[in-house]
Every structure is written in structure tokens, then in C-alpha cells.
């Protein structure tokens, strides 16, 4: 960052219901949005023709708007399907990139669906146990420890 801050520098940007630190480089700053990782951020910025060495606070309004539209409609900007975080959606079979609040909603809906159809994963979530096949005999214990009293 240069020693002199530009006049139109924004220290905090509000993008997709998320506060973004304007002092960070743009590629890493937009990873604060849920559903946007470093790889996706780089691809979006390349498609939007934005210099990766810029700070987030240096972006103009139309540049921010361009980044948001590309993030929300990645297939229109020729970002491949395998790059997206929601592939072959269970309900409509579409490919999309789910961001911010939509990601929380989709995750909750998926868990509710698994619980409703009484799938093994759904039941494990319901019971509060490990879901991905880990051993649970000794690790992952919660609650108070049960002590053993010594025999006299």
C-alpha cells in the first residue's frame, strides 16, 4: 500500500451483506464473503479485468458492481461448471455459485431434507454425532466425565 491514501479510498466496503476490509488486496479481501475462496476470487477478478494488485478500497463503484454480477452469474461469464460450489442441485438440477446468506439457507435446507428422509447422514446430524465415518469410542466426548470410585 502506498504511503498516501487516495481521496476516494473506502476503508470498509459492503458487498453481498458482508463487510470487506478496504486495506487488503482485492483478491483476498473478497474471500470474506461466504462461498468465495481464493481460487474463485482470482477467477472472478480476471473475468472482470481488475488488477489483482489493487486494494479493495481503491475499486470504483462500477468495478465492484461488475465483480458482484460475475460472482452471482458465473455461468454467463464462462466460468466452468466444475468450478462452482453447487453442482446438480437436488431440487432443480442446476449449477450455481451460492454466496453469503444463500449458502447458509442451502446448507440448512440440505440438512433438513436429510433429516426428513431419515438418511444416515441426517440422523447423525440430528443426534449430534460425527457424520463422516470417524470413530467415536474415545474421541468427541461431551458432557461431564464419569469418575470411577476406588474399592476399599
Swiss-Prot record:
One cellular component term from this protein's GO annotations in UniProt: small ribosomal subunit
Signal peptide: none
The UniProt record lists the keyword Thylakoid: no
Superkingdom assignment: Eukaryota
Keywords noted in UniProt: Cytoplasm, Ribonucleoprotein, Ribosomal protein, RNA-binding, rRNA-binding
Subcellular location: Cytoplasm
Molecular function terms, GO-annotated: rRNA binding; structural constituent of ribosome
Stored InterPro entries: Rbsml_uS13_C (IPR027437), Ribosomal_uS13 (IPR001892), Ribosomal_uS13-like_H2TH (IPR010979), Ribosomal_uS13_CS (IPR018269)
GO terms classed as biological process: translation
Pfam families, sorted: Ribosomal_S13 (PF00416)
Keyword RNA-binding: yes
Chief location of this protein within or outside the cell: cytoplasm
NCBIfam families found in the cross-reference section: PRK04053.1
Function: Component of the small ribosomal subunit. The ribosome is a large ribonucleoprotein complex responsible for the synthesis of proteins in the cell.
Subunit relationships: Component of the small ribosomal subunit.
Family: Belongs to the universal ribosomal protein uS13 family.
HAMAP family per UniProt: Ribosomal_uS13 (MF_01315)
Protein name as it appears in the record: Small ribosomal subunit protein uS13
Species name: Ictalurus punctatus (Channel catfish)
Gene field: rps18
